[in-house]
């Protein structure tokens, strides 16, 4: 992260608030869990979950979003690089910084289009 002349941090890859559901699976576990993607960039995600996930854990994640009348997703393989306790009204859990380690090119294109889109995620259209 760089510091601008005005003293504000500038990221190489800007983050976009998303508020989208995701499913994740710890690489060594047979079951899936859920959470919310708070924001994203081309290199990482800020995710929210009620589960306590250790730093360094590798996750397979599918971020879900509507496309017309269907639900679609893009998938990433990532690593938890930081975590914080997080509280909201009637909710307690964790925020995690997830570094994207691997993503298929088609999924990367979907993520980039979602991030660069000026419309709401529910209006995002995936190329056929």
Give the ranges of each region predicted by the language model.
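C-terminal output/interaction extensions
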Residues: 87-128
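Short, conserved beta-turn/loop elements at beta-strand boundaries and strand-helix junctions
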Residues: 27, 42, 83-88
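Short, Lys/Arg- and Gly-enriched loop/turn segments at beta-strand edges
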Residues: 67-75
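Conserved hydrophobic positions within beta-strands
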Residues: 37, 78-80
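N-terminal helix initiation/capping motif
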Residues: 1-40, 48, 112-128
